[in-house]
């Protein structure tokens, strides 16, 4: 997918880049697969900020995505490729032979007119086909991977993401995650063949602050620019460096300090992600 540039009508627009929409079909979205999500703007049910630097952003409708791929042994045809405002990859509208329509994440190479199918048994290894991990050959590139059978894909879903099957051991399949982490996942879990499309998303330049505001991202203020009451780095006469190691507003070390809690599933991690 090509990256497009813009004429520098304003200084901020000079360095802004975007993605070409030539792959998107000019069909309206399926209304039955659209829904409105509540805008929390980073607040909890008490109205207090629990996630900083968030706001409402541009109005948008959520597309209901089929992450479970549980419509087994019924062929579907890709009838449209659409933009999804809630994710950085494209989505594909699949029309099945029984008339049902579902959205799936578009893998690289999946185009209008292609066939997709999912099954609990084995299938040909083709982009967009979904099956259980135990039926996928070692070395295959996959995405939209379940962590628990039947729960729906949770891993490798963003633009350009993919994982690889590295081996098998007992009832587990060894997966190399996009981060480089090696992990056991139950062989009964579903996964989809291929790499998530729109990999060029990582190369676009936001270019201007207003574009992030449209995405619902508010500006971040440096701790050193605050008062002492607001941040451990705050205060001082003029520009001053922080004393000691950098910390969060709540005093937690900000660089290199491990905050991950131990949990039962840690035993399924063979090796940690690469730095």
From Swiss-Prot:
Gene3D superfamilies assigned: 2.30.30.30, Nucleic acid-binding proteins (2.40.50.140), Ribosomal protein L2, domain 3 (4.10.950.10)
Molecular-function annotations in GO: rRNA binding; structural constituent of ribosome; transferase activity
Chain spans, region Disordered: 220-275
Biased amino acid composition, Basic residues: 257-275
GO biological process: cytoplasmic translation
GO annotation, cellular component aspect: large ribosomal subunit
Subunit description: Part of the 50S ribosomal subunit. Forms a bridge to the 30S subunit in the 70S ribosome.
Purpose: One of the primary rRNA binding proteins. Required for association of the 30S and 50S subunits to form the 70S ribosome, for tRNA binding and peptide bond formation. It has been suggested to have peptidyltransferase activity; this is somewhat controversial. Makes several contacts with the 16S rRNA in the 70S ribosome.
Protein name: Large ribosomal subunit protein uL2
Name of the encoding gene: rplB
């Amino acid at each position: 997918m090509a990256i497009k540039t813009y004429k520098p009508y304003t200084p901020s627009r000079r360095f802004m880049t975007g993605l070409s929409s030539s792959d998107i079909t000019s069909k309206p979205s399926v209304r039955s697969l659209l829904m409105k999500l509540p805008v929390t703007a980073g607040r909890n049910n008490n109205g207090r900020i629990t996630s900083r630097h968030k706001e409402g952003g541009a109005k948008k409708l959520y597309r209901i995505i089929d992450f479970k791929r549980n419509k087994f042994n019924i062929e579907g045809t890709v009838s449209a490729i659409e933009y999804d405002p809630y994710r950085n990859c494209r989505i594909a509208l699949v029309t099945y032979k029984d008339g049902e329509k579902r959205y799936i994440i578009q893998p690289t190479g999946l185009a209008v007119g292609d066939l997709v199918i999912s099954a609990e048994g084995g299938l040909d290894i083709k982009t967009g086909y979904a099956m259980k991990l135990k039926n996928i050959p070692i070395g295959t590139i996959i995405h939209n991977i379940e962590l628990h059978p039947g729960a729906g894909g949770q891993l490798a879903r963003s633009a350009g993401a993919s994982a690889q099957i590295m081996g098998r051991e007992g009832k587990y399949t060894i997966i190399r995650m996009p981060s480089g982490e090696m992990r056991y996942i139950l062989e009964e879990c579903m996964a989809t063949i291929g790499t998530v499309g729109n990999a060029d998303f990582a190369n676009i330049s936001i270019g201007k602050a207003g574009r992030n505001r449209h995405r619902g991202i508010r500006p971040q203020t440096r701790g050193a620019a605050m008062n002492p009451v607001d941040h451990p780095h705050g205060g001082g006469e003029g520009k001053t460096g922080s004393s000691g190691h950098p910390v969060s507003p709540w005093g937690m070390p900000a660089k290199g300090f491990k905050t991950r809690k131990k949990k039962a599933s840690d035993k399924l991690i063979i090796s940690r992600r690469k730095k």
